[in-house]
Structures are given as C-alpha cells and as structure tokens.
Amino acid sequence: MRFPELEELKNRRTLKWTRFPEDVLPLWVAESDFGTCPQLKEAMADAVEREVFGYPPDATGLNDALTGFYERRYGFGPNPESVFAIPDVVRGLKLAIEHFTKPGSAIIVPLPAYPPFIELPKVTGRQAIYIDAHEYDLKEIEKAFADGAGSLLFCNPHNPLGTVFSEEYIRELTDIAAKYDARIIVDEIHAPLVYEGTHVVAAGVSENAANTCITITATSKAWNTAGLKCAQIFFSNEADVKAWKNLSDITRDGVSILGLIAAETVYNEGEEFLDESIQILKDNRDFAAAELEKLGVKVYAPDSTYLMWLDFAGTKIEEAPSKILREEGKVMLNDGAAFGGFTTCARLNFACSRETLEEGLRRIASVL
C-alpha cells in the first residue's frame, strides 16, 4: 500500500483537505488517505487517453462486475439485469423513499445516523420515527411499522457505529417488514470493509427479504471514488425492477462515464487492494481504540468501516469535543451533534497512515 506524503494529500484539493486551515489535521469526512488502487489509476489514465468524456453507455459491464464481486465476497449476487447505475447512494435512498414506499408514510431512522439519513425525511416530506441504533430493537421497529411507518433506513454495515448485522437478525427484520408491507432501504456502501467474518446481503436471506429490500451501494468508501459519481441500486424482485424502469430518465440520470469505468474496474480487479486496505485499517482500528481508551474516551470499535464513534462524556471536553479538538488540538473530527444530537460524541476517520494516525491521537491527547 502506498501512503502519499502530506503535501500530496493536500494537493488532491478534495473536501477533506480544503474545508479547514492547513494547520488542522483532517480526520473527519469519510475519505481515505491511501494511494489509489493501481488498476483504477490505469483505467482512468486509459479513459483520459481515449478521451472518454461523452454520455455514459448502458452499464452492462458494471452490472456483471458488481454481481460477480458480490458472489465472490458475500456468497450472494443480484441478477445483473436488476442492477442500475445512479449518481450516488443518497440519490438512491431518496428515490427509494419517493417511488417505492407508501405515499406519505413515515420513515424509521436509527440514531446516531449518517447525517443525510436525518435530512431525507425532511426533503421527501415525511415524518421521521427515531430509534436507538445501539440497540436496533426489533420490538421498537415493529411498533413503528404498526403505527404506520412505511420504511426503515438500514445502514448495513452501520455508519457511524460500525455494526455488522447477522443473517438471523436481518431475517427477523425483513419478516417484520413483510408483515406490515413495509420496505427496508439498505445502504451497503461500507460492506466491502468488514473486518471479521462476511457481510450478509440483506436482500439474499429469504423471500421476504427479497420482496422488502431495496439495496444501494457504491465503491466510494472501499476504493475512495466518491468524486466519480457512480453508485448502484439493485432490486431483488421483478415488481421493483419494472417500477424502476418506468421512472423518467430525468429522475435517474447523472452518472459519470468515468465513474462507470472506475466501478467496473475495482469490482473486477480491485480485491487485492481491498484485502490489503482491510488489514491496514484493522491494525489502525485496534491501535486507535487502545490509545483512546487510555485517555478515558468511550470507544465504539467498528466491525466494519474506517470510522470510529467516540463518546467524550466525562472528559473535560464533553460539551463540544469536535469544536474544542479543532480549536485547541488542531485536529478535526466529525461533530456528533450532526448525527442526531450526540453532543458529547465525535467520529474519527482512521483511513490514513500510521504516522498520521499517531499524530492525530497525539493532538487529541494534548487537549485531554
């Protein structure tokens, strides 16, 4: 794995490296510092050389690539004909709510949540029913469905807690959803980054799961391709496929042709890079968790993702940890308040070199 020097990372000029002053070390937004997958760089260079800048073609190669990757990694792959390219995961979630749930029905949102999950009910004109993501209590979910909720936003693996859900749990969850004719809208963007065991594809666990789940994923986190604008949505029953095909192109369009090439490439050729990334991230996770616990921070060590949820309650910075760490320690973590009002919490991104991680932890320790 190649780790770019700090100046190289700054020269990327991405959001992570431009939002805050240069003396602030960014360990916040879900963007990796790793060098790019070599096969991906080659594919992008080839596309630029061939001047592939026009309208994107049908994504048939991507469909097969995603299905093959899912089958190899998870033991279940969708029908390639049920896979469709979309600009990004959040667009897919919004479309799923608007076109595949009961009109006007409430949305179950487990908290803490990836901030766009909290915004989605607002922008789709729906009521939100909040539940505790630490518990993901099935009785609480069933009550919400019984009270009229039409869908659950199911981030599996979970962001920011890093929870990986079992087949048994998903089976029970989707059975409950089927009972109330509700939908499970599944965000699997972090699925490639499971540390122990195997990710369970929710749509593949049962017939009820196939009928209730709408699945959205992308290569954005595992291969750092967020700026290339190509996610994937796939369906696991014919009725949903038909409904999707009936949507206007205006509703679905916006995929980047370079994003299509990138996603197809890494699904087909990027597993060696992925495996190497996972080992580095696992080591970083264990190191960061041990060091932060020594400082009195409550650590939720993730089973997946390179994002670590931290609770600073009981420390001297509990009132505004992200703000204080940025101002006094010159290190930036995501503010827990944005994830549903968790004001004593923050989210740390450890997808970086050990040197960078050690420096970030040193800055945190200097404040605590």
UniProtKB/Swiss-Prot annotation:
EC number: 4.4.1.13
Pfam assignment, any one: Aminotran_1_2
BP GO annotations: methionine biosynthetic process
The protein's required cofactors: pyridoxal 5'-phosphate
Phenotypic consequence of gene deletion: Cells lacking this gene show methionine prototrophy, suggesting that additional methionine biosynthetic pathway can be present in C.glutamicum. The mutant strains also completely lose their ability to show resistance to the S-(beta-aminoethyl)-cysteine, which is a toxic lysine analog.
Cross-referenced InterPro entries: Aminotransferase_I/II_large, Class-II_PLP-Dep_Aminotrans, PyrdxlP-dep_Trfase, PyrdxlP-dep_Trfase_major, PyrdxlP-dep_Trfase_small
SUPFAM superfamilies attached to this UniProt entry: PLP-dependent transferases
Gene3D superfamilies from the UniProt entry: Aspartate Aminotransferase, domain 1, Type I PLP-dependent aspartate aminotransferase-like (Major domain)
Catalytic activity: L,L-cystathionine + H2O = L-homocysteine + pyruvate + NH4(+); an S-substituted L-cysteine + H2O = a thiol + pyruvate + NH4(+)
Modified residues (N6-(pyridoxal phosphate)lysine): 221
Pathway info: Amino-acid biosynthesis; L-methionine biosynthesis via de novo pathway; L-homocysteine from L-cystathionine: step 1/1
Keywords per UniProt: Amino-acid biosynthesis, Lyase, Methionine biosynthesis, Pyridoxal phosphate
A molecular-function term among this protein's GO annotations: pyridoxal phosphate binding
Keyword Chloroplast included in the entry's annotation: no
Enzyme class: lyase
UniProt record similarity statement: Belongs to the class-II pyridoxal-phosphate-dependent aminotransferase family. MalY/PatB cystathionine beta-lyase subfamily.
Protein task: Catalyzes the transformation of cystathionine to homocysteine.
Full protein name: Cystathionine beta-lyase
Protein's organism: Corynebacterium glutamicum
Encoding gene (name): metC
